[in-house]
Curated annotation (Swiss-Prot):
Residue intervals of the Protein kinase domain: 31-287
Alphabetized Gene3D superfamilies for the sequence: Phosphorylase Kinase, domain 1, Transferase(Phosphotransferase) domain 1
Keyword Phosphoprotein recorded: no
Gene symbol of the encoding locus: CaMKI
Chain intervals for the UniProt region annotation (Calmodulin-binding): 307-328
Name used for this protein in its record: Calcium/calmodulin-dependent protein kinase type 1
Length: 345
């Protein structure tokens, strides 16, 4: 069976000639592959022109089947999720192709760059700008949640600007760890450590609320330029997250509104039952009202972003599989400790 769809779906895309010859349409029939945009463990992303209209360009994620062997379910899940989601702030999967060696995902091209890079480049940046960014993310994630999808890996690197335009919208990308709620209980320790919710580290069953926590972490960074949780020792980092220990340090938070701080507290609440949903967050005065300050905070935020994120251990280490393994080990230890405490009572 094709990785990217049913035989019925594949047949719809095939022409009569293709059926007669017993082959599927090839990606080269429609697209001209151009520059390499990036590479990953199992894939590369190439720029491509549409043959019929060279003015139209797309991104093509080319996945090596041999490298992917044993992880096909993960790719199928990502494709199912992307096919379900149609939102102006979510990078769209346009179509898919497959041959003997590769799977090709034709993806909407976004050209505006990463979130933090754009903020650093700006001449002016305010709480209101941060509020507008977070509102767009909340609207997209609220839509995802209504569709029964949990992203599970929301972080700044997965937030891209659609275009270089000053008023460009923000786009959510990378659904490799996303999951549909109807596909079973979620309890796997996954995601990016600095942005992961306490219940994930505690290896408890979790749901949509993990995305809200991650948005809270992103909002925190957008207002000061550094992460709410950090330690060179990963076990200490995880302990901070489990307790929800973060501060609004002076002088970095002195000019930030109380409304912004309250918003972050509501999203980064350790108690899942008390943590805001996306809909509640969208109704908070910092998002929906005029509570966000218009004072320019660009100098302090951009200075901290450059110090804490550009080529930093934070950005590099949080892509590492080794750290994810540590998360799982830590979560397992937490379960054992809780079990022993329960038995001793």
């Amino acid at each position: 069976m094709p990785l990217f769809g049913s035989k019925k779906e594949t047949a719809k895309k095939s022409s009569k000639k293709d059926k007669d010859e017993g082959k599927m349409p090839a990606v080269e029939d429609k697209y001209i592959l151009k520059d390499l945009l990036g590479t990953g463990a199992f894939s590369q992303v190439r720029l491509a022109e549409v043959k019929e209209d060279p003015s139209r360009v797309v991104a093509i994620k080319i996945i090596d089947k041999k490298a992917l062997k044993g992880k096909e379910d993960s790719l199928e899940n990502e494709i199912r999720v992307l096919r379900r989601l149609q939102h102006p702030n979510i990078v769209q999967l346009m179509e898919t192709y497959e041959d003997r060696e590769h799977v090709y995902l034709i993806i909407e091209l976004v050209t505006g760059g990463e979130l933090f890079d754009r903020i650093v480049e700006k001449g002016s940046y305010t709480e209101k700008d941060a509020s507008d960014l977070i509102r767009q993310v909340l609207e997209a994630v609220d839509y995802m949640h209504d569709q029964g999808v949990v992203h599970r890996d929301l972080k700044p690197e997965n937030l891209l600007y659609y275009s270089p335009d000053e008023d460009s919208k923000i786009m959510i990308s990378d659904f490799g760890l996303s999951k549909m709620e109807d596909s079973g209980i979620m309890a796997t320790a996954c995601g990016t450590p600095g942005y992961v919710a306490p219940e994930v580290l505690a290896q408890k069953p979790y749901g949509k609320a993990v995305d809200v926590w991650s948005i809270g972490v992103i909002a925190y960074i957008l207002l000061c330029g550094y992460p709410p949780f950090y330690d060179e020792n990963d076990a200490n980092l995880f302990a901070q997250i489990l307790k929800g220990e973060f501060e609004f340090d002076s002088p970095y938070w002195d000019e930030i509104s109380e409304s912004a701080k309250d918003f972050i507290r509501q999203l980064m609440c350790v108690d899942v039952e008390k943590r805001y949903t996306c809909k509640q967050a969208l109704g908070h005065p910092w998002i929906s009202g005029n509570a966000a300050s218009t004072e320019n905070i660009h100098s302090s935020v951009s200075e901290q972003l450059k110090k804490n994120f550009a080529k930093s251990r934070w950005r590099q280490a949080y892509h590492a599989t080794a750290v994810i393994r540590q998360m799982r080990l830590f979560a397992t230890k937490q379960v054992i400790v809780r079990r022993k405490l329960s038995e001793s009572q």
